[in-house]
Amino acid sequence: MDSFEALNKPPLSPPGWVFPVAWTILYILMGIASYLVLISGKPNKTALQVYGIQLVFNFFWSILFFKFEMYLLAFVWLVILWLLIFVCSVLFYRISKPSGYLMLPYLLWVTFAGYLNLYIALFN
């Protein structure tokens, strides 16, 4: 993380403490959303598969970005993650409207993360 602190960051980059707080809230909301889909009693296999796939993409983004410092590849990975989250949110919404809405903060945060990631990729 020392190398992250030394990066040229974008103007809207939040202080470091915001990230763990935001991710904690997001993971709670995502967990509730997936639980609502799971207990809905409606066909949910595809929605939960997409949910699982986007979680894997989320996990590996951190490795690409922080461990390997492959900022441009991480951005491309993040775009794919964003698309997966969008599809997941739509599928969740079709099964349980509240679960779809609970995914929106995650989608918005990853959109913001895309801005941060792209800036870092271009200016470092």
Language model features with spans:
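Interfacial loop at the N-terminal end of multi-pass membrane proteins
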Residues: 1-21
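Membrane-interface loop-to-helix entry segments
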Residues: 14-28, 69-81
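Core segments of transmembrane alpha-helices
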Residues: 23-34, 54-57
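Structural signal for the C-terminal ends of transmembrane alpha-helices
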Residues: 34-42, 89-94
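Membrane-interfacial loop-to-transmembrane alpha-helix junctions, especially the N-terminal start
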Residues: 43-51
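Hydrophobic alpha-helical segments of small multi-pass membrane proteins
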Residues: 51-59, 75-88, 106-110
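Juxtamembrane boundary at the C-terminal end of a transmembrane helix
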Residues: 114-124
